[in-house]
Amino acid sequence: MVFTPSKEQEPAINDRQKDILVSASAGSGKTAVLVERVIQLMETGLSKDAKPSERPNIDDILMVTFTTDAAKNMRDRIRRRLVGATDEHMKAQVARLALANISTIHSFCEQLIKRYYYVIDLDPQFRLIDDAEQQLLKEQAWQATLDDWVANPDQVGALHQLIDNFGAGNLESVVQALDTEADAQPHPSDWLAGLSGLYQFEEGADPRQSAFFKRLLEPLVGPQLKELRDQWAALGEVGPARFAEQVEEDLAKLATTVDDQGHLLGSWDSLAQTLNKKNFAPKLRKRKDDDDPELLDELGVQRGGLRDQLGDLHDTYFFQSAADLVKYGQKAGALIEILTRVATDFRCHYQIIKQDRRLLDFSDLEHYAYAILTGENINPKVTWSDEEARAKRQAAAQVQAELQRHYKEIMIDEYQDTNRLQDDLLRLLHKSGQNHRFMVGDMKQSIYRFRQADPTLFKDYYDQFSADGQSSEALDLSDNYRSRHEVTDLVNLIFEQLMDQQLGEMVYDDKASLKPKADWGADRDQASPATPELLLFDGGVKKTTANPTGEDAIVVRQPEDKVASEVWLIGQRIRELLAKETILDPETKRVRPITPGDIAILSRAKRIHSVIAEQFAKLNLPVMVHGVENYFKATEIRVVMSLLKVIDNPYQDVPLAAVLRSPLIQVAPEVAAKFGLSQGENRIGFTEPELAYLKVNSTSKDFFGVVQQNYYAWRDQEVEAVENHDALTEEELAERVAGDPAGLATKEELGVNCGLIYLKLARFFELRDHLRRVAQRRPLVDLIWTIYQATGYLDYVGGMSGGPQRQANLHALYERASGYEESGFKGLYQFIHFIEQMQKKNDDLGEATTALAGDAINVMTIHKSKGLQFPIVFLVETTHQFQADRDPVTIEPQAGLGFTYVDSTANETMRVKHPLVQQAALKEKKKRQDRAEEMRLLYVALTRAEQRLFITGYVKDADLTKKMDKWNRAFDSASPLLTTTTRLKGQSMLDWIMMTLVRTANFPTLREGVEAAATPLRGLTKAAYQIKLQNADQVQAALNTPLDLHPNATAEQATPAAATSRQFKADLERVLNFTYPDQVATQTTAFQAVSTVREAFARQDPTNLEMGRLEIDRDQIKEAGAYLAPEERAFENPAFITGASDQEPTGTAIGTATHLVFQKLPLTEPLDEGAVRALIKSLTESGLIDNPQVAAGIDVAGVVSFYQTGLGQVITAHPEQVHREVPFSMLLSAHDLFSGIGATDDSEVLIHGIIDGYVQHDDQIDLFDYKTDRISQAHPEEDLQELADKYSGQLVLYADALTKMTGVPLEKIHRHLYFTRAKRVVTLSAPPSSHEPKEEA
């Protein structure tokens, strides 16, 4: 589809020769604008009067994105725009696209380091480490730091001061927090050294003159005090004369504290005295002559609230005299200087450990790249002389100048998530008058402050560029092409009342508000109503109805906890959507039923995800969970970790019980059947009665002793009772144990089968002993992979709910164990200890990522949803309270560090805690920053919705009345913007949402007495919405009520209630109990690989080939190797008989390796011999190619030549449509396939194979197959013809399989063979009705 920019977008695409910042609201098409600007720069040049020869190439433009996926998306979009270009310059860009710098900031820095490492004397042979490995190394660095300080008599006393103040346990976390913040600064050491500045005061000067007061305290307190003063003045305007006089007195006092601009007045001590609420008279007493005593009483209450707020300001910030502020500030400053010295030493140790092992973390990439451009020495092991330092700075200046000349424009996406180091780094690539910056972002979507992103950078640039307008400009994109107006109206209504500079760090004005521009077509009013819904589960109403009974009941128990209750409410609404309602298809804009893949559930935290997965499984709602509360709490990880603990030390009761109860211990179905059990009955894991039986039949105190005693007692008893005990199998032993009358009463009481218990015990000890041998002899990663293979657990979890995510988690555990060992750490015990330490710190290694599910409801955090959009969005758990700051220190990168000072010198037996004003001010600043982040998270969540928006929460009856009082505080403001105090009182997203809705005309009465306290406020954005409260009875009844489908619903979209109907159960039993009627056929040769029968396809009648039918005899089949009966098989003699050498690589091995190279080659990068050789080296080092002689036998030139052919060019032009190594299986009639060999009419042959590759484009498919056959130099054409005939039938089957897989007609599938040795493409069909091979050089 051709992109046509709007008038709003045109300046962002066409403006030249200036730095540009684009503030692009959600859904404004910023990616399309970025791509179009790149295309226009290459088409028209860097200036309006640029000559054709001056136009830049794609690799002259630096494009920095926030994520790897975003970079890939950008590259793909540019490629699609370039393909088909007619201009020679633009056509040339297709080939140059592989050279383009389109990457994340870290990838760009890595390229820079690998190219210019010599500037800073860095070893170029480094390896990047992940978060887990980083944490291990930091543990070592911290221990080394402590050892140094303890060993130094001059420092050990200072270390004790830190431990006295922060505690031994907290000190490490404080230092590591400082280290993390320092990493985001251009000059970490300078930043650390400046932290004590917040506590420095000039001798004899009032604290009001300090940097602390001017930079931190006044910006916080001044505006808030002015807001209080204004509210105070408004009270005096409506009250009686006596009250007005009191207010006048109050205002006279306040006038000495703050001016109209929010600047504080007077000295520190005068402010402390005036702001004390005791300085303001209490509430007026009623008098008989009062005209309106009720009004006076109400006004008195409001004034009392303002008086209390004033008192809070005093008690929070002005509780100390100026003298005490200076005194304790100096003591705290001295302690911070010690702390920063420890932090600096820690960073030095950590850096040395990494350099000794040639390791880099992600922050190193940025710092080393920055050093390359500045010539700074950041290597603690190297000291430069003055001459060396000067030479390094000159070399850095040359690199910087070279890059500035090379990059004609620097484009940065998601600039709001940039930190100060990244900002400085990118500015070094810019030179005024030589190149320009194009920065795109949206401060309203900056949600990564916890990763040291600084959204104020974007705001500063926006203000600066807006004021300039000449050499730079700021542009706004607020037109929304994503969402229906019902969604954007609600978003505007909420944020015009919530977001401003004081609490939100920006103003939500007309430039920031969303303007709906999405075209939903002519059917836009035919879909179900798109009014946003606020769904609240009322947990205060007790459940009164009995649980339903009968086979058709879905919900037979209502969960008591609020999280599960809210999930039932969500499930109920989704169930209704799937059964009854429609949306507009995002692509066709036609009305269609809603499918699970249309729905996304977004949450602030992961804690609700596991509950959703569990409860939705009961509702038969398909779900894909992207992220659980904690990686190590995922069931599959806990099971494997329990097994690792048991392998290390079996005398651990909880891990042992977890293993025994898990699917790791299984009895084969056919064995279980011999004990009268069905295939699924009690054969997977030990049941609770079985474990209880083991316990009561043992005298051991520890659980492993219980298990051992039962197993060996049974085994020894039964083995001794049999003469030929060597021939006794475990199954026979189990049968004897099952008949053993010992413990019969207990068996009958517990309902267990001793034979089955014995088999499970035997399986456990067999598995444990095998894995212990592996653990003793092989690396940790081999042990973990052996667990997966020996137990089949990796496959087992794949069949569970959220299977792909669970499998990804297990693969990630393997990878993390690999990283653990690569860091030099060894041993199972140490690995387990490391994991336990991570868990104690509430740290997490991060869950493995999975792709979005197209056929299931996607569940993810708001952070995960950034950059995505969905037709229907549920924002859930909005009543979850904002987190309070409980850290021992408060760090604000631009302000400083706050903590509580502990004085242990004043009294030998007592430690005195002194709260510091700096700590209070930093906590308040941090709180506001956190609230601003929560506000932006709410914005991101709401703007993911295209058509339907649902907001859910949980409230209780008693809490609802209290909450309504809080929400009604919105009426304290007579303007659309809520007061800062009101917004700060909001403890959850739901609080904020309800505060913004309560002043609208359509706010309903939630319950009797629970309603808006005043008349609606005029001037607010008009937005439709619904608020629904439902209790347990209502939700349960709805879930158990069968739903009538809308006329367009398919069977797959039927109500999930049908999933539990009698018919479904009958169908399920029929499937589970199904007996395959042709079991014997599975033991024949009806399973054939395409490669084993391809000879049978040679020189066939083309008509028969098209029909999938062959006329061949038995000898031909035998020659092809597809034997019909076991007695006719003739296997080749093994190498030890024939004497064949296993040193020389076979043609098959080389062919397999060549196919692997074709499969792994990145199609978006330059495909030359260097790239191929580098890939072969990588595959060899990783063990995928395990024989160097095989690697040497790969025809590198033959691989490269393929991509220089016409077919190869088609492939590289459509990399996203290329599919490689595609497996398939299909059933063909044996009678049709092998006519003439006596196959019965009802026999079928399962053909399986792997298609080397195909590319689907322009409604057709090019199917290609690589061949490494030898070609005679004397008769190459004859050989090619013969080989083409030989393989033609094989490609007919491939084409037939592709037709069934893709739906593309056979006549539109072109078949090609590529012979690597001849470097030739032979086209067998174009279309398949033409059977004359066509050759292409």
Swiss-Prot record:
Keyword set, alphabetical order: ATP-binding, DNA damage, DNA repair, DNA-binding, Exonuclease, Helicase, Hydrolase, Isomerase, Nuclease, Nucleotide-binding
Entry GO MF terms: 3'-5' DNA helicase activity; 3'-5' exonuclease activity; ATP binding; ATP hydrolysis activity; double-stranded DNA binding
Organism classification: Bacteria, Bacillati, Bacillota, Bacilli, Lactobacillales
Domain UvrD-like helicase C-terminal residue range list: 522-867
Protein name: ATP-dependent helicase/nuclease subunit A
Enzyme Commission number, as recorded: 3.1.-.-, 5.6.2.4
Organism annotation: Limosilactobacillus fermentum (strain NBRC 3956 / LMG 18251) (Lactobacillus fermentum)
Pfam family membership, one: UvrD_C
Subunit structure: Heterodimer of AddA and AddB/RexB.
Cofactor(s) the protein requires to work: Mg(2+)
